[in-house]
Amino acid sequence: MAMKLNALMTLQCPKRNMFTRIAPPQAGRVRSKVSMASTLHASPLVFDKLKAGRPEVDELFNSLEGWARDNILVHLKSVENSWQPQDYLPDPTSDAFEDQVKEMRERAKDIPDEYFVVLVGDMITEEALPTYMSMLNRCDGIKDDTGAQPTSWATWTRAWTAEENRHGDLLNKYLYLSGRVDMRMIEKTIQYLIGSGMDTKTENCPYMGFIYTSFQERATFISHANTAKLAQHYGDKNLAQVCGNIASDEKRHATAYTKIVEKLAEIDPDTTVIAFSDMMRKKIQMPAHAMYDGSDDMLFKHFTAVAQQIGVYSAWDYCDIIDFLVDKWNVAKMTGLSGEGRKAQEYVCSLAAKIRRVEEKVQGKEKKAVLPVAFSWIFNRQIII
């Protein structure tokens, strides 16, 4: 971990076939996707630089109102031009409704349990939307003080939330009609997750907040895109379209958030790279890390292990996202940085390669132990991870 790499070096992640199982972590040692990110901590200077409540933060984001209107709000779709969940579900007003449900269940019956565990986990993550909206509304400079402010930042947050709301609605209804999952246990998990809240470690700082959302939206895009490919592989073209449309939304949202940080890096590269480094040192906390169904205290780790196992999202994707953001924000080419900024620059530019080396060593040394895990979402049927 102490080894330094050239800041301009970008390593490509080894490609993984999503239809081939990735070696899972050793039994009893299931790892979070981000567990190897860093053991270092940000210095006090970082927190001085990013201290919440600075008047300059409000001034900066107020000055970017017009820019956000012209460059960020364009990534939203009007309600009239948006797909809705009912577009992909059986029509309850039709005489053919029962036949449509039967056809849907017929397509779903041969899809493996592993896939449904991941699809349920993705849906539960989407359903905790109130938590994510509240995170953005706590950030200085962009918060929606009244709940209906007309600023570009507040407008974006509300409209983004409205678009995202369709994702959980559609997946929830699909899973309900599929007959493959225990909806009551899923509903309990959703209630537990929303009730537990989430600390993203963004400290109400918009720099950190937008770095977090840039990372998360791209991760979610990757996850839904891969569930779409798997659904196609299993022969359910309708489900593939469902997941594909959700992935398309996530990619569009990721583009907007990434563009915001790109603008911040142009205006204030020092603060931006320090914020980026700070978030990566603290490790990006996945939105559903507090997932709980009333019995499995390690539910999130078990869910993510299955996601990695079937090729939906893994440590390799985490590394690819870091490299993507480093490149998109031109981190390696930043100049005029403070001493703290240069340290942050060096850290983030070499991080993905370090994680890959550690992960390759871990996977190379781990015994191929198996762990049968019962998931309440699929009526306590066991999956080997």
Curated annotation (Swiss-Prot):
Q: In which tissues is it expressed?
A: Found only in tissues which synthesize petroselinic acid, such as developing seeds.
Q: What is its main location?
A: plastid
Which residues does the annotation say bind Fe cation 1? E126, E164, H167, E250
**Enzyme category, top tier:** oxidoreductase
Record text on cofactor binding: Binds 2 Fe(2+) ions per subunit.
Residues involved in Fe cation 2 binding: E164, E217, E250, H253
Its subcellular locations are: Plastid, Chloroplast; Plastid
Q: Which GO terms describe its molecular function?
A: metal ion binding; stearoyl-[ACP] desaturase activity
Give cofactor(s), names only.
Answer: Fe(2+)
- Extract the Pfam families matched here: FA_desaturase_2
GO biological processes: fatty acid biosynthetic process
Q: Which reaction does it catalyse?
A: hexadecanoyl-[ACP] + 2 reduced [2Fe-2S]-[ferredoxin] + O2 + 2 H(+) = (4Z)-hexadecenoyl-[ACP] + 2 oxidized [2Fe-2S]-[ferredoxin] + 2 H2O
Described function: Converts palmitoyl-ACP to (4Z)-hexadec-4-enoyl-ACP by introduction of a cis double bond between carbons 4 and 5 of the acyl chain.
Q: Known PANTHER family for this protein? A: ACYL- ACYL-CARRIER-PROTEIN DESATURASE-RELATED, STEAROYL-[ACYL-CARRIER-PROTEIN] 9-DESATURASE 7, CHLOROPLASTIC
**Family of this protein:** Belongs to the fatty acid desaturase type 2 family.
What is this protein's record name?
A: Palmitoyl-[acyl-carrier-protein] 4-desaturase, chloroplastic
Q: Which organism is it from?
A: Coriandrum sativum
